């Protein structure tokens, strides 16, 4: 090859390499521009598809940086659309309950500014669990805490903190309320808050931090609600409310709410004679509630809510080991599934239970007469067999020498099933402990487990002699 041919060959190869490099740079530039300007194509609808007019809630918007040959490419990850909860997964199969949370509010009140509360409960959004309670408008070490044994005053407010965080001075006051219920529909919180005169109270419906609707007393006799979480399925939330006598016939209605707006009201139907303070849980496609009969029965009423056609049915828990306090001893207590047992039916306490096939998981005070101690167990046939009394898997939550109080259920959705959890109110102060002038509580929380577990007792634990008077 002569010198001229060598020069031509080298030039051709160099030109080819330069051309390839140039084309590669153009390709990289085109890719960068295309990725940057095609963000709108994330989850883009098919052609001619009608898009909804309402806004779509975006949970997060993350930019991922990819480095390629010293060239930065920004790739927009498609945002996640927040959806309504439907609770369609099966209920978790459990062997019992394991400790989950305890806030120690009364013990902490001995040396800190902690709210005076009662009627606590727990509810969860899709990410976190929160504890709620009705505050008395005062901290414990405060003269305003005197005589806080009373249920209904205009200063009571609904408090909300992350579960396990006591109600300190920085706690958010969600609304004015001496009776309440809260639940999260998957997009935002709904709070049902009742306050006002005993004979003409108002229930406010607050959704996503805004007052959306309200309803006044319909029987002019202490309008009241669950004191535990409501339940939302596919954007419709339901809450049980009662107005009328606490020891005679009352008017119970089941309200259906969508994004804070009342869309339907159904009267109570079925055989339940008196219904208060229901503990409700999702039982897809409906909702089931275990309530308090403060008139005729120490066996607990059951309210079944059809979320599709708004129909209601009611009955009583079949278990002959009844759940209310006061009650007969277990040898003489009864329940026939349909009617109140007329056994020490007046008075009572908020409680919970839930069905497990034909069986029943339930909790109750250990004392049959007082709000003392707390136990859980499973009743074989307790959901389907009248007067069933075969008990297994008993656990002591609070020993019988210590005070308890209200209790209620809340549900937590896992990857494959829905777990049932419960809380126990641990009341301290008046009326039983007369050294002090206040009445308040702490809580302990347990959740269902498929594992093994040990034993113990988890009372409030405050030494009343250390407490402010």
Curated annotation (Swiss-Prot):
Q: Which residues cross the membrane?
A: 10-30
Report which superkingdom the organism of origin falls in: Viruses
Q: Name one GO biological process term.
A: viral budding from plasma membrane
| Segments of this protein annotated with the region Involved in apical transport and lipid raft association | 11-33
Q: Which residues form the active site?
A: 151 (proton donor/acceptor), 406 (nucleophile)
Q: Which parts of this chain are annotated as the region Head of neuraminidase?
A: 91-469
Say if the entry is tagged with keyword Glycoprotein.
yes
Q: Name one GO cellular component term.
A: host cell plasma membrane
The UniProt catalytic activity note for this protein reads: Hydrolysis of alpha-(2->3)-, alpha-(2->6)-, alpha-(2->8)- glycosidic linkages of terminal sialic acid residues in oligosaccharides, glycoproteins, glycolipids, colominic acid and synthetic substrates
The cofactors required by this protein are: Ca(2+)
Membrane topology field: Single-pass type II membrane protein
Q: Localized where?
A: Virion membrane; Host apical cell membrane
Question: What keywords are annotated for this sequence in UniProt?
Answer: Calcium, Disulfide bond, Glycoprotein, Glycosidase, Host cell membrane, Host membrane, Hydrolase, Membrane, Metal-binding, Signal-anchor, Transmembrane, Transmembrane helix, Virion
Which pairs are disulfide-linked?
92-417, 124-129, 175-193, 183-230, 232-237, 278-291, 280-289, 318-337, 421-447
Assembly behavior: Homotetramer.
The molecule here is called Neuraminidase
Q: Which organism is it from?
A: Influenza A virus (strain A/Tokyo/3/1967 H2N2)
Task: Provide the taxonomic classification.
Answer: Viruses, Riboviria, Orthornavirae, Negarnaviricota, Polyploviricotina
The gene designation is NA
């Amino acid at each position: 090859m002569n010198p001229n041919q060598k020069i031509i060959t080298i030039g051709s190869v160099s030109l080819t390499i330069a051309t390839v490099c140039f084309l590669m740079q153009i390709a990289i530039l085109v890719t960068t521009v295309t990725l940057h300007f095609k963000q709108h194509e994330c989850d883009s609808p098919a052609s001619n598809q009608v898009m909804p007019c309402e806004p779509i809630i975006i949970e997060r918007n993350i930019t991922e940086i990819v480095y390629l040959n010293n060239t930065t490419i920004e790739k927009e990850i498609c945002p996640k659309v927040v959806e309504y909860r439907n609770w369609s997964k099966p209920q978790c199969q459990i062997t019992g309950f394991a400790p989950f949370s305890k806030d120690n509010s009364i013990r902490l009140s001995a040396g800190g500014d902690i709210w005076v509360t009662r009627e606590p409960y727990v509810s969860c959004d899709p990410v976190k669990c929160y504890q709620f309670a009705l505050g008395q408008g005062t901290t414990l070490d405060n003269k305003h805490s005197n005589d806080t044994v009373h249920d209904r005053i205009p200063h009571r407010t609904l408090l909300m903190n992350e579960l396990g965080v006591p109600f300190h001075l920085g706690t958010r006051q969600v609304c004015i309320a001496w009776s309440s219920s809260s639940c999260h529909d998957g997009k935002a919180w709904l709070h049902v808050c009742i306050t006002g005169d005993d004979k003409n109270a108002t229930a406010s419906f607050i959704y996503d931090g805004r007052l959306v609707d309200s309803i006044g007393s319909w029987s002019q006799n202490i309008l009241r609600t669950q004191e535990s979480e409501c339940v939302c399925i596919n954007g419709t939330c339901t809450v049980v409310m009662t107005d009328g006598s606490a020891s005679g016939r009352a008017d119970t209605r089941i309200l259906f709410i969508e994004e804070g707006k009342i869309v339907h009201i159904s009267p109570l139907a079925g055989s339940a004679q008196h219904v208060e303070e229901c503990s409700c849980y999702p039982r897809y496609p409906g909702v089931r509630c275990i309530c308090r009969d403060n008139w005729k029965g120490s066996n607990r009423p059951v309210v079944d809510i059809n979320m599709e056609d708004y129909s209601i049915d009611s009955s009583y828990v079949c278990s002959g080991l009844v759940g209310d306090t006061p009650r007969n001893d277990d040898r003489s207590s009864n329940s026939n599934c349909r009617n109140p047992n007329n056994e020490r039916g007046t008075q009572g306490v908020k409680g919970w239970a839930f069905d497990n096939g034909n069986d029943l998981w339930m909790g109750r005070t250990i004392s049959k007469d007082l709000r003392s101690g707390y136990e859980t167990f499973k009743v074989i046939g307790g959901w389907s067999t009248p007067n069933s009394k075969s008990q297994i898997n008993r656990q002591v939550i609070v020993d019988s020498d210590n005070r308890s109080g209200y209790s209620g259920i809340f549900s937590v959705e896992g990857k494959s099933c829905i777990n049932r959890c419960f809380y126990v109110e641990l009341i301290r102060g008046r009326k039983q402990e007369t050294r002090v002038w206040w009445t308040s509580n702490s809580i302990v929380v347990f959740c269902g487990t498929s594992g093994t577990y040990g034993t113990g007792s988890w009372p409030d634990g405050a030494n009343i002699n250390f407490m402010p008077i």
